[in-house]
UniProtKB/Swiss-Prot annotation:
InterPro entries named among the record's database cross-references: ConA-like_dom_sf (IPR013320), L-lectin (IPR016363), Lectin_LegA_CS (IPR000985), Lectin_legB_Mn/Ca_BS (IPR019825), Legume_lectin_dom (IPR001220), Leguminous_Lectin (IPR050258)
Binding site for Ca(2+): 131, 133, 135, 140
One Pfam family cited in the UniProt record for this chain: Lectin_legB
The UniProt record lists the keyword Chloroplast: no
Protein name per UniProt: Lectin-4
SUPFAM superfamilies hit by this protein: Concanavalin A-like lectins/glucanases
Single GO MF annotation: metal ion binding
Similarity-based family: Belongs to the leguminous lectin family.
UniProt entry keywords in alphabetical sequence: Calcium, Glycoprotein, Lectin, Manganese, Metal-binding, Pyrrolidone carboxylic acid
Record note on quaternary structure: Homodimer of Alpha and Beta forms.
Organism, as annotated: Griffonia simplicifolia
Carbohydrate attachment residues: 5, 18
Length: 243
């Protein structure tokens, strides 16, 4: 499939079934109006040590046997609801092999195993992380941050995410683009009445990921927060660029 194009302007009016449009793994679930990535108790409070993923049920082609590589654009709105201090650990938009599974909770964001998280030879995933916890062991900067991860929890690029945005329980809009010609992955994060954040990095997705991937959202909780995806648009096309 050369082109993938879908839009969920909200999650109120769609009767999503697990595995038909959106696949839920781990603790992720559908609630009225949102995809909830991590667990809450009967009172709606966050459950610690939780991890979950919500992904598009059809695979996305990143490249083909003729040498074409795909460009893509995705936008989504999310709410990272903070229930007090401390709060951890954040969420990520990811691309991974279609048979990949949800991994460890906390700072691993459901994308990595703790034994191999920092070893690029043991992982196959590219992610844009929105990280609310400082993990010094992984060379995190000393503040909440947006990062680009390539086969490792140790980000190849980061930018500061100001505390009042990261912990403010405000709806954020993310735009992520990948240009197959320049091989530049870019993320723009914005708030309606606040700041904009931008981060870019060169990564050749055709060299680090398989031909077909699973795309979606992953989150891990160490402390008191819950992640909700409120809308999602995605478009990709094999545009003829030689990979």
């Amino acid at each position: 499939q050369n082109t993938v194009n879908f839009t969920y302007p909200d999650f109120w009016s769609y009767s999503l079934k697990n595995g038909t449009e959106i696949t839920f793994l781990g603790d992720a679930t559908r609630i009225p109006g949102a995809l909830q990535l991590t667990k809450t108790d009967a009172n709606g409070n966050p459950v610690r040590s939780s991890a979950g993923q919500a992904s598009y049920s059809e695979p996305v082609f990143l490249w083909d046997s003729t040498g074409k590589a795909a460009s893509f654009y995705t936008s989504f709105t999310f709410l990272l609801k903070n229930y007090g201090a401390p709060t951890a650990d954040g969420l990520a938009f990811f691309l991974a092999p279609v048979d990949s599974s949800v991994k460890d909770y906390g700072g691993f964001l459901g994308l990595f195993r703790h034994e191999t998280a920092a070893d690029p030879s043991k992982n196959q995933v590219v992610a844009v992380e929105f990280d609310t916890w400082i993990n010094k062991d992984w060379n995190d900067p000393p503040y909440p941050h947006i990062g680009i991860d390539v086969n490792s929890i140790v980000s190849v690029a980061t930018t500061r995410w100001e505390n009042d945005d990261a912990y403010g329980s405000s709806i954020a809009t993310a735009h992520i683009t990948y240009d197959a010609r320049s091989k530049i992955l870019t993320v723009l994060l914005s708030y309606e009445h606040g700041r904009d954040y931008i981060l870019s990095h060169v990564v050749d997705l055709a060299k680090v990921l398989p031909q077909k991937v699973r795309i979606g959202f992953s989150a891990g909780v160490g402390y008191d927060e819950v992640t909700y995806i409120l809308s999602w648009h995605f478009f990709s096309t094999l545009d003829g660029t030689n990979k």
